[in-house]
Every structure is written in C-alpha cells, then in structure tokens.
C-alpha cells in the first residue's frame, strides 16, 4: 500500500497500518514546478479523453487541470451528503468523462470505489455489486435501467442514498418504476 500526501498532511488519521508514505512536497523536481505560475499550471493537461463526438471520427480531447477542477467543483456542488463511510460504484469505461469523476471524487472523500471488471457482464455485475456491498452511491445510464427493467421487482437496494442518471436522456416513467427498488435514494439527473 502506498499513501501519497503533502508535508502538512495529518498522518495520524491513517492509523498504524503498514503504508509506504510518499511526501509529494519532497519529490525531485518539486522546486522547479513551484516556480511555474499558478495559471500556467492550471493550463497543463490533466488527461486526454477520446471521443467520437457528433462526427463519428475518434479524436483526443485534452482536458486541462482547470477543466478537471471545474468539473469536480460542479459535481461536488450538488451537496451530496457523502463521506469516508460511503461505497460508490464506478461502472463507466475510462474513455467516458463521467468515469473520471466517478473514480476520483469518492477517493477525495476517503470513500470506497467498486468497479466492474471488463470481463464481467456489466449490467448484471452492477446490481450484484450494489446489493452485495450495499453501495450508497451509483451513477448509471437509462439504457442500463431499461435493460434491467424486467427484473425491477427482484431488485431491492435500501442502502443506496443517491442514484445519478447520466449519458443520455431519461424517461420519467422508467425512473418511477425503478424508484421502488431504491426506496431511500435521491435521484439526480447528471445528463
């Protein structure tokens, strides 16, 4: 296990487990990077996402640190009541922008992230994870809900606090039918 932290991190919060601690303030090249202006740092790429967009032609789109920060701030401004005790689902391909927030946001809270392996049948594995680990937060697509709609009567997820619906337009009727399966969840349209 490796723990990345800065010099001002209170390390007592991590217990006495066996961690390899890396102080990012002491990494080689740190002094040089601190000489760069804040604005130029924000303009640096955080990652590149590949999308076909409306053209159907795959292209790489650079996402700057400022873009990522804005996306993260917008996501966290939704006033979730989430913390390190929550268990969150990340089911999206890493080429989809929601995957970045679905992975990074929970980790910044200290929450657990559960992912669907590429070898699994995604739509069934999602609900297996939600049920088995009593996940508290999930973002899914309306297509996934539509595919599983014949099984709504068998799905009971009382631990789910938030259900984000993303990637495409949602049908109100479909969401209302699914509401019985997630009686304690607040629905959030993230499309």
Model-assigned labels for residue ranges:
Residues 19, 30-191:
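Motif- and composition-driven signal specific to adenylation
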Residues 1-27:
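Structural core segment of the AMP-binding/adenylate-forming
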């Amino acid at each position: 296990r490796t723990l990345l932290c800065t010099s001002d991190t209170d390390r007592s919060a991590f217990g006495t487990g066996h961690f390899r601690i890396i102080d990012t303030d002491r990494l080689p090249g740190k002094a040089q990077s601190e000489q760069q202006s804040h604005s130029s740092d924000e303009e640096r790429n955080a990652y590149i996402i590949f999308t076909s967009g409306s053209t159907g032609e795959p292209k790489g789109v650079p996402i700057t640190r400022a873009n990522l920060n804005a996306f993260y701030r917008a996501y966290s401004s939704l006033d979730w009541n989430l913390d390190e005790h929550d268990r969150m689902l990340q089911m999206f391909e890493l080429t989809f922008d929601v995957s970045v927030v679905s992975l990074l946001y929970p980790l910044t809270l200290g929450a657990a992230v559960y992912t669907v392996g590429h070898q699994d049948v995604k739509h069934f594995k999602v609900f297996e994870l939600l049920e088995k680990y009593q996940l508290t937060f999930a973002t899914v697509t309306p297509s996934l809900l539509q595919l599983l709609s014949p099984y709504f009567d068998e799905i009971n997820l009382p631990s789910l606090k938030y259900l984000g619906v993303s990637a495409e337009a949602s049908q109100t009727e479909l969401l209302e039918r699914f509401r019985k399966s997630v009686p304690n969840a607040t629905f959030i349209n993230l499309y």
